[in-house]
Amino acid sequence: MHTFDFKNRTAVVTGGAQGFGLDVAKRFLESGAKVFIWDIDEKLLKSAVDEVKNPNLFYSVVDISNYQDVEKNVADITSKSNIDILINNAGITGPTGPLWEYDVDMWNKIVQINLMGTFNCCRAIVPNMIKNNYGRIVNVASVAGKDGNANASAYSSGKAGAIGLTKALGKELADKDIAV
């Protein structure tokens, strides 16, 4: 497997307690990075740290849909280190069903996590990347955001918004050494 050199780099991986997010975190650790995994589920976070057993893996319980929570955790990290890499992986699919029957509170929750969570993390972390003239951001989306999935309008809409946010942010940062 190809290895990368991320020594002296710090990554934040949202939704990093399990699945794809944890796999990404492990890969960064193998490449020498310091990694902070964020998730809403402390039990899963502790389990991930116990499984990985790497002194460069740290965790925080973070609700990415809450900007103040994100901002506080970013400040905690940046008081000791730069944040060089952001992997916005956290997301939820929610229940399926036709739009006209969809629970409004659930719709808002899905969009709040899948779109606003991505915005909140970028909004809080990008200034640190600009200050340090370096950053890499990956916003995990879905083909559902491009094509739309029947009976998954909230998920499709949130991911479509995340795709648009990614394109816009990439253009805003095009003149800096920050790739989105």
Regions found by a protein language model. Give the residues of each.
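Substrate-binding pocket helix/loop in short-chain dehydrogenase/reductase
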Residues: G97-L99, M106-N108
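Active-site loop immediately N-terminal to the catalytic Tyr-X3-Lys motif
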Residues: W100, D147-S153, D175-K176
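Residue(s) in the substrate-gating loop at a strand-loop-helix junction
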Residues: S142
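Alpha-helical segment proximal to the catalytic Tyr-Lys
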Residues: P127, K171-D175
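Active-site helix of classical SDR
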Residues: C122, G158, T166
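The beta1-alpha1 cofactor-binding region of Rossmann-like NAD(H)/NADP(H)-dependent oxidoreductases
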Residues: E42-K43, S60-K72, V104
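Canonical Rossmann dinucleotide-binding motif of NAD(H)/NADP(H)-dependent dehydrogenases/reductases
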Residues: F4-F36
